[in-house]
């Protein structure tokens, strides 16, 4: 059986089941990502968790605990450029990807790993925010899962028609003149977790907010700031027909 290299996991802030182990995986384009596994002895099935933008494995420790209580093994990952996975630019706080479809290579690596380990079936999957956008495209060509759930899926970015046109033009110019790896306009190293609870855009739950702040304060290597211009342009193109894609799944 193939051996997978163990990776760090910050159990002091994940508050997940003690049965967790985490590993490094290498994608087909040689990007190193991180995957975590919380095993259940009951083996009712496996739930895959696809995180959103700026998220990381540790955020889903409590979710894994809840799933384990119901007899389910669970899996989550750090997408490229997120958590402890390889960052793609010299500035680790820049949220960047060359093309949005590259995230599919990350999920393919996780599926191959899960198949190798023969994780208990049936398989289920949850896609949150950006993870929902990635998952939607994966489901068009793959039938690994018995059931799928989406949480606030990022199936588009709400922009007025003039602003959308500007974004495409700006993104094209940025690529030609090679500043597409800079922060997108109005964005910076400041991320979701740099706001106060009152101004945050993630949650109305003060306990959850404290949970997230503890994680990124104790382990700042998990943090990601704003996205690059390349990320935004690629996201707009990738999600432009998401509504039609959902019908075809």
Placement of each model-derived feature along the sequence:
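An N-terminal hydrophobic leader/cap segment in hydrolases
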Residues: 1-26, 34-37
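Glycine-rich nucleophile elbow surrounding the catalytic serine of serine-hydrolase chemistry
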Residues: 127-137
